[in-house]
């Protein structure tokens, strides 16, 4: 009992401690809980904790019921012990009465034997008298014999006396028969009482055995309750660890998103710095050309018209430079033709898409219409954040923040505006130095997703600024390359460096996306582990229930077997006084064992 009380107090204190811990953890993870409830409505951790608390409460109730049953069984056992003591006293009294009746029966049997012997002697005397009478009748013929009356008178007197004694003996026999019948009835009643006492003693033995079995079952239940408490504490600790890891992973995901945003900001800054660098390089080249021209003019001012001759080295350099520019212009013409064709095709595609979008916008104006996501939304970097089994598709906005899926009207309007800007500035891009590659890249961007259209518009603006600068540069040069407005003075080394930086930035972005995907996979694995843990806990609970049901079935089968054995043993307990004298010793032994168990 003391152990049971200590176990209950320990379980109650463990429950209070877990409740305090949950109360301490709950304010810190309030946003996460709200996010979980928004995502999939319920928290599996809370559901599991509530289920375990309900199981602990059920076990506590079962323990209280078992203690109440133990108290009731103890009271009933005390009453049965008192009844057994009373029955043993009555049994001893009946044994004494039986011994007295047996002694009386023996004395009466001796008297009956004596009366039977006397009866036999009287019958023999009667037969002898009859023989003498026959002799007398046979001897009447003789004259010498005395008279018959003289002979018969004493014989008749003896006969009367013998008849009187016989009558007395018959009366005594009748009285003895009555006494024997009364004694037999008393013996039957005593046997019935003895049988009832033995049956009650057997019932008391059965109840004592059942009480011992119940005590053992209560101990087993207490041990199981302790084991369940330990398992409950372990599961609570595991759930807390898993929740902590989930929070850490969420923080890591948020940090990864912030890092991705920072990387995008750095990419933009690098692009802006590269543009500024291009502009500065072009201004420097322009300044060098003007300085060379000024130097040539200053050198030729003091000479005559016939002596104004350019040095051969400078002439060769300018000729080489002009030939290179002519070759570049030819290449640019070929690239411009290709880009014009591709842009014409893109223009047709975008016109078709604009028509489709306009038709969609002219449709039902209500917000309940199904969002039409065009085919341009392809393999964009939309990640799936799976937390607790919920899939949330998110798009990366141009400022790098994670945003939810916008409504259909906003997506259509953004697509239409971005595509109109692209079509508006399609011809301007063909005048740039790397216009073909940029147009192709822009086509890839438009194929990869609608969230990259802002970048394409930024590229168009960059091309426009470069075209304006090129026009100004050609006016200052005054060379034959003024006919085409697509010249570019950016050196090839700088362009290669910029291309390498762009490739490295793309690799960094790819690595960041890969790390984010790995983190998403880790979150999915953790969610799967939580699901497997919940399934394992359910399987363990089912196993425990099955084991309890099997134990109950075994106990019921054992009870039935013991009842059958007791029923089979009961007829063998009534063989004689020897067995009855041995019965109290058998009853005293289990009672002593029960008292030892109770102590």
Swiss-Prot record:
Domain of life: Eukaryota
GO cellular component, one term: cytoplasm
Renumbered residue ranges of the record's region Disordered: 1-30, 357-453, 557-599
Coiled-coil regions, chain positions: 43-349, 533-570
Compositionally biased tracts (Low complexity): 404-420
InterPro entries per record: MAP70
MF GO annotations: microtubule binding
Keywords, in A-Z order: Coiled coil, Cytoplasm, Cytoskeleton, Microtubule
Biased composition annotated in UniProt, kind: Basic and acidic residues: 557-568
Pfam families recorded: MAP70
Biological process (GO), any one: cytoskeleton organization
Region of interest (Required for targeting to microtubules), residue spans: 227-460
Subcellular locations according to the entry: Cytoplasm, Cytoskeleton
Function: Plant-specific protein that interact with microtubules.
Similarity comment: family membership: Belongs to the MAP70 family.
Name of this chain's protein: Microtubule-associated protein 70-2
Organism per entry: Oryza sativa subsp. japonica (Rice)
Primary gene name: MAP70.2
């Amino acid at each position: 009992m003391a152990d049971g009380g200590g176990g209950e107090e320990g379980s109650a204190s463990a429950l209070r401690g877990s409740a305090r811990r949950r109360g301490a953890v709950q304010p810190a993870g309030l946003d996460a809980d709200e996010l979980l409830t928004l995502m999939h409505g319920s928290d599996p951790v809370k559901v599991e904790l509530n289920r375990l608390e309900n199981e602990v409460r059920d076990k506590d109730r079962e323990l209280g019921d078992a203690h109440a049953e133990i108290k009731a069984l103890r009271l009933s056992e005390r009453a049965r012990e008192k009844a057994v003591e009373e029955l043993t006293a009555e049994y001893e009294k009946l044994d004494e009465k039986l011994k007295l009746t047996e002694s009386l029966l023996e004395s009466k049997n001796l008297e009956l034997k004596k009366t039977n012997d006397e009866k036999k002697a009287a019958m023999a005397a009667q037969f002898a008298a009859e023989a003498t009478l026959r002799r007398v009748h046979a001897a009447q013929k003789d004259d010498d014999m005395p008279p018959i009356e003289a002979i018969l008178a004493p014989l008749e007197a003896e006969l009367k006396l013998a008849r009187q004694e016989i009558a007395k003996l018959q009366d005594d026999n009748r009285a003895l028969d009555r006494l024997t019948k009364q004694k037999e009835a008393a013996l039957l009643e005593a046997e019935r009482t003895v049988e009832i006492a033995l049956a009650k003693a057997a019932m008391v033995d059965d109840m004592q055995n059942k009480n011992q079995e119940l005590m053992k079952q209560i101990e087993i239940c207490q041990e199981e309750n302790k084991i369940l408490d330990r398992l409950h504490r372990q599961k609570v600790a595991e759930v807390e660890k898993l929740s902590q890891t989930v929070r850490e992973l969420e923080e890591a995901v948020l940090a990864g998103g912030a890092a991705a945003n920072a990387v995008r900001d750095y990419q933009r800054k690098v692009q802006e710095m590269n543009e500024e660098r291009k502009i500065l390089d072009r201004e420097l080249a322009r300044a060098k050309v003007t300085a060379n021209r000024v130097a040539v003019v200053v050198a030729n001012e003091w000479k005559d018209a016939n002596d104004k001759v350019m040095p051969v080295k400078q002439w060769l350099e300018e000729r080489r430079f002009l030939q290179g520019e002519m070759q570049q212009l030819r290449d640019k013409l070929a690239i411009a033709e290709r880009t014009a064709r591709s842009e014409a095709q893109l223009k047709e595609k975008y016109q078709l898409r604009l028509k489709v979008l306009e038709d969609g916008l002219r449709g039902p104006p209500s917000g309940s219409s199904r969002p039409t996501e065009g085919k341009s939304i392809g393999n964009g970097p939309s990640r799936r954040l799976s937390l607790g089994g919920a899939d949330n598709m998110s798009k990366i906005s141009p400022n790098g923040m994670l945003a939810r899926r916008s409504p259909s009207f906003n997506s259509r309007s953004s697509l239409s505006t971005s595509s109109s800007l692209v079509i508006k500035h399609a011809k301007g891009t063909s005048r740039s130095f790397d216009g073909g590659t940029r147009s192709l890249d822009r086509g890839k961007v438009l194929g990869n997703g609608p969230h990259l259209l802002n970048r394409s518009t930024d590229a168009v603006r960059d091309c426009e600024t470069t075209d304006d600068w090129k026009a100004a540069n050609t006016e200052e040069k005054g060379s034959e390359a003024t006919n085409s407005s697509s010249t570019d003075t950016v050196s090839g080394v700088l362009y290669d460096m910029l291309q390498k930086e762009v490739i490295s930035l793309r690799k960094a972005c790819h690595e960041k996306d890969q790390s984010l995907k790995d983190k998403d996979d880790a979150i999915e694995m953790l969610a799967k582990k939580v699901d497997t843990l919940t399934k394992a806990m359910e399987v363990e609970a089912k196993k425990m229930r099955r084991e309890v049901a099997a134990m109950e079935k075994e106990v019921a089968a054992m009870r039935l077997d013991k009842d059958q054995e007791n029923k089979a043993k009961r007829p063998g307990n009534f063989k004689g006084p020897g067995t009855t004298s041995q019965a109290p010793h058998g009853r005293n032994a289990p009672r002593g064992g029960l008292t030892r168990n109770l102590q």
